[in-house]
Amino acid sequence: MKDWRYWLAEQRGTLLAFGIFIVMFTIYTSNHPAGFTANVVQTASNKGVLLAFVAMAQTLVVITAGIDLSVGMIFLLTNCLASWLVIGTGIETAFGVVAVLGTGLLCGAINGAIVIYGRLQPIVTTIATGAVYFGIALLLRPFPGGSVNEDLADALTGRLFGVVPASLVALLAVVLVVWVPFSRSVLGRAAYA
């Protein structure tokens, strides 16, 4: 019995956030013209997962006592880059995905190098680099438009078995591959401490 109470006390913040989410989603679907349908849930999942990816990236930085104001601009840059590179055949799309992920990694490495070796405050560095990343994104896509490989887009925004939003499965995969190992590693435990 004590184990259950301990777990409940330890997770009360997460459970409260989940409860608030359920209440807000219920209000959202009750006010939506289509009501609570599979399409409404799928659309909300697709939009929410994008925000969750950005939030996870920012959380890793904040846990290590930093701040990165360029995360949104890196997300924007990689989206614009994806609209140029993640097209064509399966192999071309795969190379495009690797290039886009590599670009995000490079942007983060640039931020880290400037903070560490340039000895600048993270907030100043990431505001400046965010402006640069935004400028590059505008050079790539001065006007809204572009697309990515339709098969990949359908696979990541569709429904599995006609019910489960694929974007939620992608989010779960990222959590299992990135977040869980980080939180259980020596580095992750040290960051939380």
Regions found by a protein language model. Name each.
Residues 1-19:
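Transmembrane alpha-helical segments of polytopic membrane transport and secretion proteins
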Residues 21, 25, 76-80, 104, ...:
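Residue-level recognition of pore/gate-forming positions within transmembrane alpha-helices
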Residues 14-19, 44, 52, 73-77, ...:
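Hydrophobic alpha-helical transmembrane segments
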Residues 25-29, 36-89, 114-120:
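Single transmembrane alpha-helix segments in multi-pass membrane proteins
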Residues 20-36, 64, 137-142, 178-188:
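Structural signal for alpha-helical transmembrane segments and their membrane-water exit/capping regions
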Residues 90-130:
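Alpha-helical transmembrane segments within multi-pass membrane transporters and channels
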Residues 70, 94-95, 121-124, 186-192:
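Residues that define the loop-to-transmembrane-helix transition and helix capping
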